Curated annotation (Swiss-Prot):
GO process annotations (BP): protein K48-linked ubiquitination; ubiquitin-dependent protein catabolic process
Residues that bear Phosphoserine: S378, S1009, S1061
Result, substituting S378A: Abolishes phosphorylation by Akt and impairs ubiquitin ligase activity on Akt
Tree of life domain: Eukaryota
Compositional bias segments (type: Basic residues): 1019-1029
Chain segments carrying region Disordered: 423-458, 786-805, 1012-1068, 1215-1295, 1773-1842, 1894-1944, 2004-2025
Alphabetized InterPro entries for the sequence: DEATH-like_dom_sf, TPR-like_helical_dom_sf, TPR_rpt, TTC3/DZIP3-like_helical, TTC3/DZIP3/RBM44-like_helical, TTC3/DZIP3_dom, wHTH_TTC3, Znf_RING
Function, in words: E3 ubiquitin-protein ligase which catalyzes the formation of 'Lys-48'-polyubiquitin chains. Mediates the ubiquitination and subsequent degradation of phosphorylated Akt (AKT1, AKT2 and AKT3) in the nucleus. Acts as a terminal regulator of Akt signaling after activation; its phosphorylation by Akt, which is a prerequisite for ubiquitin ligase activity, suggests the existence of a regulation mechanism required to control Akt levels after activation.
Post-translational modification remark: Phosphorylation on Ser-378 by Akt is required for ubiquitin ligase activity.
Organism: Homo sapiens
UniProt protein name: E3 ubiquitin-protein ligase TTC3
Amino acid sequence: MDNFAEGDFTVADYALLEDCPHVDDCVFAAEFMSNDYVRVTQLYCDGVGVQYKDYIQSERNLEFDICSIWCSKPISVLQDYCDAIKINIFWPLLFQHQNSSVISRLHPCVDANNSRASEINLKKLQHLELMEDIVDLAKKVANDSFLIGGLLRIGCKIENKILAMEEALNWIKYAGDVTILTKLGSIDNCWPMLSIFFTEYKYHITKIVMEDCNLLEELKTQSCMDCIEEGELMKMKGNEEFSKERFDIAIIYYTRAIEYRPENYLLYGNRALCFLRTGQFRNALGDGKRATILKNTWPKGHYRYCDALSMLGEYDWALQANIKAQKLCKNDPEGIKDLIQQHVKLQKQIEDLQGRTANKDPIKAFYENRAYTPRSLSAPIFTTSLNFVEKERDFRKINHEMANGGNQNLKVADEALKVDDCDCHPEFSPPSSQPPKHKGKQKSRNNESEKFSSSSPLTLPADLKNILEKQFSKSSRAAHQDFANIMKMLRSLIQDGYMALLEQRCRSAAQAFTELLNGLDPQKIKQLNLAMINYVLVVYGLAISLLGIGQPEELSEAENQFKRIIEHYPSEGLDCLAYCGIGKVYLKKNRFLEALNHFEKARTLIYRLPGVLTWPTSNVIIEESQPQKIKMLLEKFVEECKFPPVPDAICCYQKCHGYSKIQIYITDPDFKGFIRISCCQYCKIEFHMNCWKKLKTTTFNDKIDKDFLQGICLTPDCEGVISKIIIFSSGGEVKCEFEHKVIKEKVPPRPILKQKCSSLEKLRLKEDKKLKRKIQKKEAKKLAQERMEEDLRESNPPKNEEQKETVDNVQRCQFLDDRILQCIKQYADKIKSGIQNTAMLLKELLSWKVLSTEDYTTCFSSRNFLNEAVDYVIRHLIQENNRVKTRIFLHVLSELKEVEPKLAAWIQKLNSFGLDATGTFFSRYGASLKLLDFSIMTFLWNEKYGHKLDSIEGKQLDYFSEPASLKEARCLIWLLEEHRDKFPALHSALDEFFDIMDSRCTVLRKQDSGEAPFSSTKVKNKSKKKKPKDSKPMLVGSGTTSVTSNNEIITSSEDHSNRNSDSAGPFAVPDHLRQDVEEFEALYDQHSNEYVVRNKKLWDMNPKQKCSTLYDYFSQFLEEHGPLDMSNKMFSAEYEFFPEETRQILEKAGGLKPFLLGCPRFVVIDNCIALKKVASRLKKKRKKKNIKTKVEEISKAGEYVRVKLQLNPAAREFKPDVKSKPVSDSSSAPAFENVKPKPVSANSPKPACEDVKAKPVSDNSSRQVSEDGQPKGVSSNSPKPGSEDANYKRVSCNSPKPVLEDVKPTYWAQSHLVTGYCTYLPFQRFDITQTPPAYINVLPGLPQYTSIYTPLASLSPEYQLPRSVPVVPSFVANDRADKNAAAYFEGHHLNAENVAGHQIASETQILEGSLGISVKSHCSTGDAHTVLSESNRNDEHCGNSNNKCEVIPESTSAVTNIPHVQMVAIQVSWNIIHQEVNTEPYNPFEERQGEISRIEKEHQVLQDQLQEVYENYEQIKLKGLEETRDLEEKLKRHLEENKISKTELDWFLQDLEREIKKWQQEKKEIQERLKSLKKKIKKVSNASEMYTQKNDGKEKEHELHLDQSLEISNTLTNEKMKIEEYIKKGKEDYEESHQRAVAAEVSVLENWKESEVYKLQIMESQAEAFLKKLGLISRDPAAYPDMESDIRSWELFLSNVTKEIEKAKSQFEEQIKAIKNGSRLSELSKVQISELSFPACNTVHPELLPESSGDDGQGLVTSASDVTGNHAALHRDPSVFSAGDSPGEAPSALLPGPPPGQPEATQLTGPKRAGQAALSERSPVADRKQPVPPGRAARSSQSPKKPFNSIIEHLSVVFPCYNSTELAGFIKKVRSKNKNSLSGLSIDEIVQRVTEHILDEQKKKKPNPGKDKRTYEPSSATPVTRSSQGSPSVVVAPSPKTKGQKAEDVPVRIALGASSCEICHEVFKSKNVRVLKCGHKYHKGCFKQWLKGQSACPACQGRDLLTEESPSGRGWPSQNQELPSCSSR
């Protein structure tokens, strides 16, 4: 790489400078991609399956032609074509992701959501290489006609939806590579690959052969010249940056170059080298693979690819790739040398790994040996450890050294990093619960590193420090290996720490950082080539972790760690973060003053931050290190500390030392509860529980709490008595409460003396208000009483219902938390009266699941259903108090149509609050919502709203932010609220939405008299006599601050709730404050400003005062809201509430705008009204903005050219694209405005993927799984990582949706965490030793002696894993394991549990072959913790019913016996299989090979289970002890209570005896009264029975009349509906008949026009023909002296005829237009066509014409038929033209001269009949008798046939003279005319267009007399050939439009064959046939019968020769008409 040239390297598409977004390779313009993938969509077309025989018959010829043409080309050309086809197949897989590409949906290695197209993980690479092997097979057999024909055949079958699995596998087998079959796996896995391969290859071969397409030229000409120039410019810049060793910037330029030239393989190879230098090995792997695909003979591309594999630790894989590269590049001698050297180096590395001992640890002797290592072999400085953005020169210098490490270390870095496994990026790491285990070489290679592979701290070394300090000497190579392993372990610990921090697992993070600090020595940190700041960042991470735990001890330790940073490491510049951390500690302790001091210090030290910091050895940015982020956080914390929340209590103990503060918060870390003591004088005294105990001990001698009741108040000056004691527990809940009611003596209040108003006008206004209030109250009471009486009369409920109503009234008085529900409850009566369609409302509520089916049925079952339904729904909503159901009820009401207008407007306004708040919610909490797992959301959405709304599958969060989708967005918020338990981080956001945003201040105007709300209760306040003024609005719910009174008192819902919760009873002003309050009220009444216009009427004042009041109001309004547009809704909303007088003032002024401009305070700017003082500021801002935009436009021009060498800290590359806002716990947390990403600076190179969007997954696609399968739980306190390019990446468990950024959504539930560094566990080769992970459903390699189909019954069982592992669905777009798939690796063996099931997408069949992997059922839960015996396992493999193991019959039939030697492969490495190793069973301990290891592993599993059971037992035991203690305490309590209750019972018994004596005396008196009352009751009952009998009779009569009236009304309504239906049907019939009549009249006129024009055209053609003959005769002027005059007369006649034709056409067109405009045909005058006669000419006689006139006559008929177009058909039978034995007869018939005595009509008879014979060719009888034409039969039987072949067949029927190649050429010409595409056209339309094109071509060609003569001249064999072949095809004129047909379509028909009689239409069965001269054949008997009445040929006569009646009723022509075809003259 020292000789660095342009062609040597270049870079591709992964821009990784800090925050450069990842570029997708599909940035390239869509127009450069060929439309190649249309053919694959045939796989999805709907159609009926084609029968195999029909398919073979139709396709065989075409495939044979294509195959023969393809194989006739040279082999070198074919191989080049195969390379081009390979690029086209892999283009959507590697270079360009298309949303609509079927390949990207079918192929498992394409992730449509993955925007990081540069990366390829190892699982995806395996699929790609398998696909490449399959594609390379076709190149090997490119000239083999047999295999190519088979390929084409299989491709056609797949396109026609015929399963060709067996043929495809056989083709691969015969192609010469059986090993591919072992890699393909089961059918579900391999079918997508095979289908893509065969269909793509078949398509491209067909395209090359049929269209003569040059794929090589298409690939070369993909890019335009401008793109090539730009790509070269970017490549040169990348070369320059590479030469300066600035690889990150070089990556950006190479990426830009690839955007312009994606087909250039050099760019990918060079970018791969840059990725290798920067440690991004997966990106280098992807670019190496792309380079080898584009140019498979380029050695450097293979070299980069093998390097990347070796860097990832895949040495065996790299070695195999190197061997393959040497074969491909054998013609390049220089490149082969590098590959050979690489081969040797890889072999040495493998040998070193295999030769090392397993008991030595590489970490132990590193530190001491480090000093003796030579400088040339020094280990690398990690380039990704700290990516600083330096602000000063010194820091820049340090960063340059750390980022590059010097030239001398670059090669060493490459060497050392080769042993580094795939943990280089934290997002690719295995699950922590699954330590990696390897087989064979993998095992020996990783036996040392297995100890450190897991991220779990339990698997790491116990004492890192001891390992590092232990000394022993090693060679330099071993020292490098040890160094790499040490750094691997350090990186793993650091990764565990910061990943746990990001996931809020603070204890795990603290454990990881603590272990790291214990192992690291700050004095020796430089020996690891780490800067001191890395150590300080680890200390900072530990402190942050302890802070997150939040317990008092951890908080103290965190404070010590922060102080340690400040004291011991002041030079590192992290003082700001340390002070901020100490402030957070104090903030956690609720010590706001101390926290404020530290936050202020941190704010002053922001400038000392060294720049944006990352966690050591990673690219994950520490969010707090970003200057903007830390500023924002500090401002938030300072604001919170300046205005701390109100404490829950204040300790009154003088010696209180609770964390140095007396304020008590429930959120205190050391909160243990408190006690609150209240006295009757409203004193409140509170103590910490500890302080209270101390106080009781020192002062009150441990007095019991209850004894303090009725004692003297503890406040010194208070004389009250303690009336209430409340004790709060440590959880903040009320633990116990003691209360004693103290009755206060009522003291008469002192009289209030108010100063009377001096203004008479104000006094009068007050009196008016009082009167109005009294009147309104009276009317409201009256109306309420009337309504209640009506309700009682209607419902007449029993007593229990009355009790329910009283309970409801009591509940109605209660205040609800939900303000929307409060509004609905308050106006329930209006809602009830305003809804007219109650049944519709209930149905909608049932469909929205607001009501359950039980509620719906109970509501319908009541008698007064219509009256009580709405009331029942509102009661139901109040009872449930569900915020979502309340909103849905409001939404349903807003969509009801039958609602009163006033109620509808109010409901719409209330409903619009939620829609308006939705946009604000998404803009404020968009970052948090992006983290959601949209797969879960899609499932919940479909479950809840699937039947009402469209699915959100495939949609992104940006879709919900659009204004058009606000309703769906609101439904998404409702869904989150209903499942809020699953989204804990969104609790505060959802509460803010429903409590504040959604339920804004609802202003309800005071109504007049009857409409006044009467449900609000009247609350009297003794001390406050002032009543609310009528002018103030009534506020129902206040989520945001609002003006509630004239003096702008701002209230909020929080204050209201706080007041309610703090107050112990109704508010009363204390006695000592009453005088002051009264004085204040009097002063307030005197000076109150009464200019609020809303909901009040202006008083009678002069107009100037009214106008000034309005001006004051609007100035105040504009000060609150700022400048507003005149068309703003706020003005119209305000105008609705204006009184009538105010509206009149505005109307007089001419509107609001002229009214406001009348005052100098207001100014209008760009139709925006603003205050004058604000206008000046706006103008200045606009000037600045204009200048700023100009500067930005100028700077954008040089954006690609100017790249400063100096790093810009403010550039977007060093900031994350997605800045997520921390979710605050409180609902009132401020929303930060700078959450959005900043714009790119002018000097920074523009990120190339800003416009790249993620691809939506198809509807049926399976869920995507993120690359590492690691969910990141996000809590409300965590600062969210926003860097898109950071090595850390958020992942989703199951996400079927596209995500715009790399930050993947996540579900809040935790799953198996994927950490560590060994995610590379794939099968590196497809041999017996390399096995896939358990989540890869691919068939592992089998030995050569084993068939690919292995029955499961023959497999020997394996041991059982401790738990069952679900299997991931196969070959979908997930290439990683998630929580539903896990791999367990133990010992040296891979054991996985997979599901064997049917061939469905969710289950795959895995045939383990020689691996012996046990196949367990996914449904079997009983197998999880049990070990099966050998027989049971065999039963499982043989298809046990419990485990549902099923084997495919096809797969089991192939092989019956499997050698048992397969089991050896489990325990013996591949390399030593052929060595002399004892593999026999070890008797007597095992009967079979491997049982000892199985028993050991089962024993280990049982040990683990026993440990778990023991731990569970200990926990249960502890819980049981606690429960027994509690129960014993309860038992003691109950015994004491029982004693007390016994004594009380004795007292009650004594009282009872006394009372019984009294009751006996009273009983005697009562019995006497009862006797008298019974007599009265008898009299009353008799009277009541009499009255009830009368009432029953009347009720029966009443019901009878009701039933009769209902029946009568029903019959009337039915009759009415029938009559209306008849009327409607009659109108429709009338319209239809009218349209048909118009169409009929138009068709009549068109027929008339055609007939008349046809006559004139015949005359014209005859005249033209005559002129031609005259021209021939005129050569002899002596013979014909009058020739010139004759020619002039004929030319004049010809011009008259043409004029007459145009005139006739115009007249008919005018009449057609008139009919279409409404006229009738009978009203129009008949078109007059002048009669034209041939000019008198005696010069030429028909007999003198030459013999060739027969041919001209034939041409005349042809031209005549061509003129008529589609209205007549050309019958080319020779009999029509009379070209039989006498060629001289045709001119006399077809070209008559003008005989003197014969009229014109008789002259035209011959030509008309000749043309009409073709029109009336078929009769219904003939249709019934003749067979179906072959063209149509073919179409009906082969409907799903290939469209191209069916088109060729149709055309060959119409034009039999052309072969398929010529017809294909015509199709190609038609396609070029149609913009080079026939998509969107049906087969009939294509046939029509091609037919028209062929006819146009024939018209253009001039007729050749010789050719015509040769074609139509009869020969001796003509009758025989004609009779054998049948009649030629005829183009029939289209009938009027019918269903499914177009008028312009030209259906192609086959004329009747010559094998049937023209009269009886029966097939000739005997030789009794008569053949006329015209060529028509008849039965002799039929023809004799015909000649009895006629003398002409039946087939050659006029138009009405064959009618629709039976043959007996035909209208035959008269005898005097002539037969020009048969008769002789």
